[in-house]
Amino acid sequence: MAESHRLYVKGKHLSYQRSKRVNNPNVSLIKIEGVATPQDAQFYLGKRIAYVYRASKEVRGSKIRVMWGKVTRTHGNSGVVRATFRNNLPAKTFGASVRIFLYPSNI
């Protein structure tokens, strides 16, 4: 039997983009596992992100739902990236895992 391979890299939803007094929920900050520099983070620009969660009500035979987004640019010097989602991620997802898919590929 063929070995299964993950098509995504794990990441954490850190926070919204913010300043001293104002936060911007349109832009989420994502820390990608194994990425420590802005140069490493460049690879992930344009990649798709999914926040997968379980809901209490079943829709079309499944309780699992997904919120989709995209990596837009890097943020800071520690390899964090900015991402926008079709619907903003709720604040209760701070610290939650997200999946950064390895497509669309630009290699």
Curated annotation (Swiss-Prot):
InterPro entries attached to this UniProt entry: Ribosomal_eL33, Ribosomal_eL33_CS, Ribosomal_eL33_sf, Transl_B-barrel_sf
Sorted UniProt keywords: Acetylation, Cytoplasm, Isopeptide bond, Ribonucleoprotein, Ribosomal protein, Ubl conjugation
Crosslink feature (Glycyl lysine isopeptide (Lys-Gly) (interchain with G-Cter in ubiquitin)) location: K47
GO biological process: cytoplasmic translation; ribosomal large subunit assembly; ribosomal large subunit biogenesis; rRNA processing
Localisation: Cytoplasm
PTM section of the record: N-terminally acetylated by acetyltransferase NatA.
GO MF term set: structural constituent of ribosome
Highest taxon of source: Eukaryota
N-acetylalanine carried by residues: A2
A GO CC term attached to the entry: cytosol
Classification via Pfam families: Ribosomal_L35Ae
SUPFAM superfamilies named among the record's database cross-references: Translation proteins (SSF50447)
Chief site of localization: cytoplasm
Function: Component of the ribosome, a large ribonucleoprotein complex responsible for the synthesis of proteins in the cell. The small ribosomal subunit (SSU) binds messenger RNAs (mRNAs) and translates the encoded message by selecting cognate aminoacyl-transfer RNA (tRNA) molecules. The large subunit (LSU) contains the ribosomal catalytic site termed the peptidyl transferase center (PTC), which catalyzes the formation of peptide bonds, thereby polymerizing the amino acids delivered by tRNAs into a polypeptide chain.
Further comment: There are 2 genes for eL33 in yeast.
Quaternary organization: Component of the large ribosomal subunit (LSU). Mature yeast ribosomes consist of a small (40S) and a large (60S) subunit. The 40S small subunit contains 1 molecule of ribosomal RNA (18S rRNA) and 33 different proteins (encoded by 57 genes). The large 60S subunit contains 3 rRNA molecules (25S, 5.8S and 5S rRNA) and 46 different proteins (encoded by 81 genes).
Record-stated family: Belongs to the eukaryotic ribosomal protein eL33 family.
Name the UniProt record assigns to this protein: Large ribosomal subunit protein eL33A
Organism: Saccharomyces cerevisiae (strain ATCC 204508 / S288c)
Gene name of the encoded protein: RPL33A
